[in-house]
């Protein structure tokens, strides 16, 4: 062994920088944005990322002789400049598929981002995109139902779904919470929702909330003749409690439940998605905590990666921001990861932040959910941006109506149907937005009041996390 094994430390780039390598269709590809410490060559930084996220360690080890390192190692095969940032660069790394457990997003993320982000040789590191090979996608369960099945279950076609988050998000008793749900649904909404942090607090235990909400949903259905639903948040402190809540929602004949997939974790989310698939339940996904991970433009994980991972882990709806509301997100970036939620094939398109072609095969799509600081004036833009396969959720834009939640719901329903009708007639709904809404308001006093109430409410802040494109 001593004749074959050279102990010591060698540069990462000697093994993991392979510019001649041509990625295989079965490779998992990742794009990292890297900013190294001063004086460290780019190739060494990129190779260090490839090594630490695959087979490498800081020292040469004798046990490498017991396996085929050339087969299993990650390979940095390309480096690119980042437009507008002379310190940063993109490192493209190919990983052989055998490095990952089949169907395990938890394992993929543990490998790619689990340890390497703490490297001293790096000042910043960000995972910008992943190309999942179709061979891996076929091992994932994906959405429990998908867009087509969800529309059939809810009997909603030809327009976005319309919903709202119950406000105030915390502090209501179960009975009063149910009353607010009823007011929204009878006013014209399709769905209402628990907020991300309503679980089972002293002021409102989860079982109490579920029972009053179920009563409200069924009463609204009887009055309106429409299928209604409420996203019952089953997120809990243990997996056992998570499933107990899901089972009770099923007993109440509720069509949809909810999970906070980042705080709850991918293992819990995949398990819940599998349960929903077996039990005929729709699954709404909230992205609480995402901005801690994805908002810094140089460090963390881009939301397009988190969105792709969610589609593989499982969910029928996912919050994506609004572009026009109170939350971070520019239009092109948002369209990029909406494509990856809904389409069967998404081509590389740097103008939308997509670094790779992504083939989703036959995996069902996910509804994009627009929620956060939106109101009736935003309706034309939301329809233009998100299209029909989306869910538009107006929380304050429903409950803040001067006449109450039912009137706010009615205003949103009239605005949505007016915009859909105008779009279907060939009108340019964003350019003609004011005319379309004002025409509809002539026949809806609820909409007229809503337009007056929110006519000056805008969220015009510069985007922190911008696309890296040549200007």
Curated annotation (Swiss-Prot):
It catalyses: 2 (2R)-3-phosphoglycerate + 2 H(+) = D-ribulose 1,5-bisphosphate + CO2 + H2O; D-ribulose 1,5-bisphosphate + O2 = 2-phosphoglycolate + (2R)-3-phosphoglycerate + 2 H(+). The keyword Transcription regulation does not apply. The lineage of its organism: Bacteria, Bacillati, Cyanobacteriota, Cyanophyceae, Synechococcales. The active site is at residues 167, 286. Binds 1 Mg(2+) ion per subunit. The modification N6-carboxylysine is found at residue 193. GO terms for cellular component: carboxysome. Its cofactor is Mg(2+). This is Ribulose bisphosphate carboxylase large chain. Mg(2+) binds at residues 193, 195-196. InterPro entries: RuBisCO, RuBisCO_lsu_C, RuBisCO_lsu_C_sf, RuBisCO_lsu_fd_N, RuBisCO_lsu_N_sf, RuBisCO_lsuI. Substrate binds at residues 115, 165, 169, 287, 319, 371. The basic functional RuBisCO is composed of a large chain homodimer in a 'head-to-tail' conformation. In form I RuBisCO this homodimer is arranged in a barrel-like tetramer with the small subunits forming a tetrameric 'cap' on each end of the 'barrel'. It comes from Prochlorococcus marinus subsp. pastoris (strain CCMP1986 / NIES-2087 / MED4). It comes from the Bacteria. Disulfide bonds: none annotated. Its main location: other. Pfam families: RuBisCO_large, RuBisCO_large_N.
